[in-house]
Amino acid sequence: MTELDEVDSLRSDGDSWTVTESVGATALGVAAARAVETAGANPLIRDEFAPILVSSAGPAWARLADPDIGWLDDDPHGQRLHRLGCDYQAVRTHFFDEYFAAAAGAGIEQAVILAAGLDCRAYRLNWPPEAVVFEIDQPKVLEYKAQILESHGVTAAATRHGVAVDLREDWPAALLRAGFDRDRPTAWLAEGLLPYLPGDAQDRLFEMITDLSAPRSRIAVESFTMNLTGNKQRWNRMRDRLGLDINVEALTYREPGRADAAEWLANHGWQVYSVSNREEMARLGRPVPEDLVDEAITTTLLRASLEISR
């Protein structure tokens, strides 16, 4: 096999995927990190459904969700680096869980999760009685999650609507057909999404969200400054040890001149709050070790509110 830094882009216009391939496989990797965190002694988040979704994809995926990271027993540095990755996923999940709790507390009962993947917030969060959650993603990814959870007797904690559509297509029309009410304030989430969109598609996404948002709507976004050093090492280990080819570098768009998410939102009527992932990790007791700083991911976690009429 080639090294990850020698692989060209695997993306093409109109490409699609199942949960175990291409972008879909990244959802399994993130769910595995949530499973590791949930099994820990003092978890920041609890996602009891993540182990079910990951292990159902096969034994190699189940090993990736091993809370002891036993598949890296003879590689202490690799184990620490993978643990750091799981810590980051826990912190980002916690940030967005708190965002939804605050939105619900402010009376916002409509939520849209973009590129929902194996996100289980519709099932595991404490939603208001009238809450409606729309999950947008590729058809096969949504089908996998719904079928696995249903087979285990899991029901959603809110009214859940799966919206099977590619975010590069006319997803607003599909969302409206599914029952979305553009006159109600909405809590939007774009977590782990932006690098998988071309820059112009990211701009269109924000334009469409703004157009669909009633006053008092909110949005939360994870904005990446991709540090590939540590990530490449983690992906290589997953491939070599588990046979899992999660090559995020080849699946993302790294275009110069891409709009900064916080700046775009601020320039279009949103009031923005942002924090670096490293500040948030330190605040929650999961600081990046000094000797791993150069290998750690760098992102900005932001939330914003819309106070003006569209």
UniProtKB/Swiss-Prot annotation:
Which NCBIfam families does its entry note? mthyl_TIGR00027
The protein's name = Putative S-adenosyl-L-methionine-dependent methyltransferase MMAR_0356
Any Pfam family hit: LCM
Protein family (similarity comment) = Belongs to the UPF0677 family.
At the top of the EC hierarchy, this enzyme's class is: transferase
User: Tell me, what does this protein do in biology?
Assistant: Exhibits S-adenosyl-L-methionine-dependent methyltransferase activity.
Could you tell me the Gene Ontology terms of the biological process aspect for this record? Answer: methylation
PANTHER family, from UniProt? S-ADENOSYL-L-METHIONINE-DEPENDENT METHYLTRANSFERASE YKTD-RELATED, S-ADENOSYL-L-METHIONINE-DEPENDENT METHYLTRANSFERASES SUPERFAMILY PROTEIN
Annotated GO MF terms: methyltransferase activity
Q: Which UniProt keywords apply?
A: Methyltransferase, S-adenosyl-L-methionine, Transferase
The UniProt annotation places S-adenosyl-L-methionine binding at D137, D166, L167
Give EC number(s), comma-separated. 2.1.1.-
